[in-house]
Amino acid sequence: MSLHVVILAAGKGTRMRSSLPKVLHPVAGRPMVSHVIDTARSLNAEKIHLVYGHGGEAMQARLNDADVEWVLQAEQLGTGHAVAQAMPTIPDHAKVLVLYGDTPLISPVTLETLLTIQPANGIGLLTVSLANPTGYGRILRADGQVVGIVEQKDATAEQQLINEVNTGVLVAPAKQLKQWLSGLTNLNAQGEYYLTDVIAAAHHSGSSIQTAQPVCAQEVEGANNRLQLAQLERFYQKRAAEQLMLEGVTLLDPARFDLRGTLQCGEDVLLDVNVIIEGQVELGHRVQIGAGCVLKNCRIADDSIISPYSIIEGSVLAEGCTVGPFARLRPGAELAAQAHVGNFVELKNARLGLGSKAGHLSYLGDSEIGANVNIGAGTITCNYDGANKHKTIIEDDVFVGSDTQLVAPVRVAKGATLGAGSTITRDVGEDELVLTRVRQHHITGWHRPVKQKK
């Protein structure tokens, strides 16, 4: 039986007080609904149906590569009505799993359990027991069997004492679900068509309803306001940090670590406080990342050390590199083994060769730098002429003195020495010494100007 997943994402999210649709608000750097889509995809669903309404253009623009079937709910008439909009394109022989775009923490393990316990021709329902169930629909049972769900606003005082609540997540056979949805009414306090009412309909039709509980209660929490969004973020990060530590990564303070992508680590990796990981990041064995660093879409090989407050994006570092503090590697930066990039050095689309060093206050853009090169403090590759970028090539064993400007396109051949304060506009030959400084003048008896009194 094929699996179709319906994700409800049509709500406006008024309490967010935002023009952005609620499900596009980020957790771990990605829209909440993107997490749900990825979880659904991990279940090998044949098709994912995304029910949208408010902010449809923004959602389609943000999720244009999500590979989902877009289902419009023009009027928000309740969760039952929302699911009904997706049903016409779902074959009768399929099973339907209903998820929510604002519950990004739901795990594949929990959903696989739910799919396993679903009875034939019946409903698998995800419930959770809460110490404070206020606001949630209560699970009604008779002789231990689920017979219905009552929403908070429709519950009696006695029913409000029930602590087993509905998460909204359920799986049901498509043919029967279509029948149950067609019988829904909006005779309730909200005047809406509740998806929860299909539970009573299934019970009355003689279908079995089995329940499962999530791995942890926080998985099924949603976000209706910024406070709840922040709480989801913290739980996500706590879970991510715990998993990394179980895999052998040292986090000096797990509460001050943010994972906004994926992180693959070798053995004995150490991350100091306030490190942020974005995109896909790979760290080799014994890599150390200092406090306040931001790593995005990069690979850092064994025994490299990144000192505090460095930013590395779209870059590849070989073994034993040292970077920072306060360095910036922009997309296209490559460091060969044992290369060193020091404080306030910026690389963009540049390769620094084996054992080469750029220790201080330099910009190296669109550059190819060989092995055993010393880049003096204040060196600038002038790569942009106002219209086009040009390349600087510095071959092996070159010594570049401090405060040197290399006006690209230019090549400095092997073993050359560039004197401090030089502006290099022409190619330099092998083992040449180049100086372009003006002659130093000495004026004796010089008196500084005196400030005139007003």
UniProtKB/Swiss-Prot annotation:
Residues 248-454 are annotated as: N-acetyltransferase. Residues 227-247 are annotated as: Linker. Coiled coil: none annotated. GO terms for biological process: cell morphogenesis; cell wall organization; lipid A biosynthetic process; peptidoglycan biosynthetic process; regulation of cell shape; UDP-N-acetylglucosamine biosynthetic process. Keywords: Acyltransferase, Cell shape, Cell wall biogenesis/degradation, Cytoplasm, Magnesium, Metal-binding, Multifunctional enzyme, Nucleotidyltransferase, Peptidoglycan synthesis, Repeat, Transferase. CDD domains: GT2_GlmU_N_bac, LbH_GlmU_C. Mg(2+) binds at residues 102, 224. The keyword Kinase does not apply. InterPro entries: Bifunctional_GlmU, GlmU-like, GlmU_C_LbH, Hexapep, Hexapep_transf_CS, MobA-like_NTP_Trfase, Nucleotide-diphossugar_trans, Trimer_LpxA-like_sf. Transmembrane segments: none annotated. Residues 1-226 are annotated as: Pyrophosphorylase. SUPFAM superfamilies: Nucleotide-diphospho-sugar transferases, Trimeric LpxA-like enzymes. UDP-N-acetyl-alpha-D-glucosamine binds at residues 8-11, 22, 73, 78-79, 100-102, 137, 151, 166, 224, 330, 348, 363, 374. This is Bifunctional protein GlmU. It comes from Tolumonas auensis (strain DSM 9187 / NBRC 110442 / TA 4). The lineage of its organism: Bacteria, Pseudomonadati, Pseudomonadota, Gammaproteobacteria, Aeromonadales.
